[in-house]
């Protein structure tokens, strides 16, 4: 398989097809859909603990009280399908119940939220096929930093966007602000995926590969979100089957689909670098031939 791809790269015929074959081979070898299923399961298990920890962080900083409400609505409006309002009510009820837990239960919530971070780390390093492991203390520090600073940075960015929105009275900035707010979810997804693909793997990732893979993942995520919402709106047959429980399979499928997109972006990032190495090796062999 690699020899065929190498030959195609050597003769510079149909390089895109050769790259796509390499991408498909990696997806198959890494069992990407199985990894996505594992991450979806852990995500659903960690969803309420993760949201509870995030809301607790915002509660600890009074200056983010207004921003936390905006961030909550922004997340459910832009990162969940059309039934986000229903899911939001259920999750907020679960989080309210979790606030009544004891200190031991609160520690359990934090551990469960960190479990999601560990699963993401493990899945991405499986795709990058990295054998190097971080020290446990360092990994815990990174997970905790993401868990604590991530929501605060998101809240700060949302506060900035709200401030820009308040400047709409300035006619000269009106069009610019509208365009920025319109593409803000895409930019946020792009930056998030880029950081994920650049920081989490324990090996060095070329920045341009991470940017390309993150951009493709962000585009697929936004397109998938709109397509999924359109399907739910136009073909509501799931409601006839599941009734009031319809929100459960919708959330399951959406989380699984989201992780498929995230891991596909990672596979694209890896394949770009691997194909470039194969092409360089093929060109070197061509130069060495008499």
Curated annotation (Swiss-Prot):
InterPro entries listed in its UniProt record: UPF0761_bac, Virul_fac_BrkB
Topology of the protein relative to the lipid bilayer: Multi-pass membrane protein
Primary localization: membrane
Transmembrane segments: 44-64, 104-124, 140-160, 183-203, 210-230, 244-264
Family annotation (Pfam families): Virul_fac_BrkB
Superkingdom: Bacteria
Subcellular location: Cell inner membrane
Keywords: Cell inner membrane, Cell membrane, Membrane, Transmembrane, Transmembrane helix
GO cellular component, one term: plasma membrane
Stored PANTHER family: INNER MEMBRANE PROTEIN YHJD (PTHR30213), UPF0761 MEMBRANE PROTEIN YIHY (PTHR30213:SF0)
Protein family (similarity comment): Belongs to the UPF0761 family.
Name of protein: UPF0761 membrane protein YihY
């Amino acid at each position: 398989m690699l020899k065929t791809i190498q030959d195609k790269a050597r003769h510079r015929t149909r390089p895109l097809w050769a790259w796509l074959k390499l991408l498909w081979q990696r997806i198959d070898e890494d069992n990407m859909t199985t990894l996505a299923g594992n991450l979806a399961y852990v995500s659903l298990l960690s969803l309420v603990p993760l949201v509870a920890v995030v809301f607790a962080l915002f509660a600890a900083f009074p200056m983010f009280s207004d921003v936390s409400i905006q961030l909550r609505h922004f997340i459910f409006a832009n990162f969940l399908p059309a039934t986000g309002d229903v899911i939001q009510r259920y999750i907020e009820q679960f989080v309210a119940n979790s606030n009544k837990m004891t200190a031991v239960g609160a520690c359990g919530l934090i551990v469960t939220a960190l479990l999601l971070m560990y699963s993401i780390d493990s899945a991405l390093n499986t795709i990058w096929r990295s054998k190097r492991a971080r020290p446990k203390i360092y990994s815990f520090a990174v997970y905790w930093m993401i868990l604590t600073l991530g929501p605060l940075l998101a809240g700060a960015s949302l506060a900035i966007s709200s401030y820009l929105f308040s400047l709409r009275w300035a006619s000269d900035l009106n069009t610019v602000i509208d365009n920025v707010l319109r593409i803000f979810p895409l930019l946020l997804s792009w930056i998030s995926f880029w950081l994920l693909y650049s920081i989490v793997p324990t090996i060095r990732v070329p920045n341009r590969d991470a940017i390309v893979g993150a951009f493709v993942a962000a585009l697929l995520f936004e397109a998938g979100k709109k397509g999924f919402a359109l399907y739910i709106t136009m073909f509501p047959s799931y409601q006839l089957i599941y009734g009031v429980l319809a929100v459960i399979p919708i959330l399951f499928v959406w989380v699984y689909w989201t992780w498929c997109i995230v891991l596909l972006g990672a596979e694209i990032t890896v394949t770009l670098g691997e194909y470039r190495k194969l092409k360089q090796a093929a060109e070197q062999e061509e130069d060495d031939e008499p």
